[in-house]
């Protein structure tokens, strides 16, 4: 299971990252069980689920990213829910509520005056939705140039990066989607433009971002900070993708850890608020280049604005006063 929130301690700015940084360090620690027809694979910090149809997804506890620069971290367990409160030096609090199964339920920012902004409300369920977290939508009707729909960060200007982070959905959004529906439904994510960054050179089997590669995230960070300054309720998904070399489980774990590493670096080195980021790995499931061999194009980190998906397309409106919940 992901490490419980009770084990979290603050990390001072500038402190070196601890723990393993390569898959080889804990591959032998994986444990596989069967539960209700599903295969559950646990490894340090991650749970991988394979459903009866062979589809796999990965889940991790994102509260670990919030330790950086925290003044204090408090944990409360009420009714099976774990409530982690990260207190920053300026008195701002980031509150993360996790369900008994490790599912993120809510993420809230509380300012020094006690006013709250709900950033993620994953407890929402559409009354007409059927089944679990997977939503199957028809392909969106894309009316913008393809290179504005999937932007290559290496060729894009800072203005295009920022414009993409502010861009509306490419097609009509019929309803609000829960956070998990966004994470696990590619057809939902396809409603939003994205930015691909495939120039970070990770070592094989590692998710550590070398110092000489970190600067490649600067233009992304500047766009994120501009967008969050404009609307403090923005949420951006940092996606990790691999090529097809290696096992499915290794690729899923590696991509998830690389996405989390990129999100962490955006906060630690460039000051992007951790609460406005989420990370998720998809392994080799969504290649840009159809090949079973090594592919630099497929080994990439993708940044995608998901705010309109979470609130039903109202993200372009000015944020309501602090303490007002997003529309249902």
Model features per residue range: what roles?
Residues 1-173, 178:
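Extended interaction-bearing regions that mediate binding to partners or small molecules
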Residues 40, 75-77, 86, 188, ...:
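Sterically constrained small-residue positions within well-ordered secondary structures
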Residues 118-120, 125-235, 308-328:
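Periplasmic peptidoglycan-binding/tethering modules of Gram-negative envelope proteins
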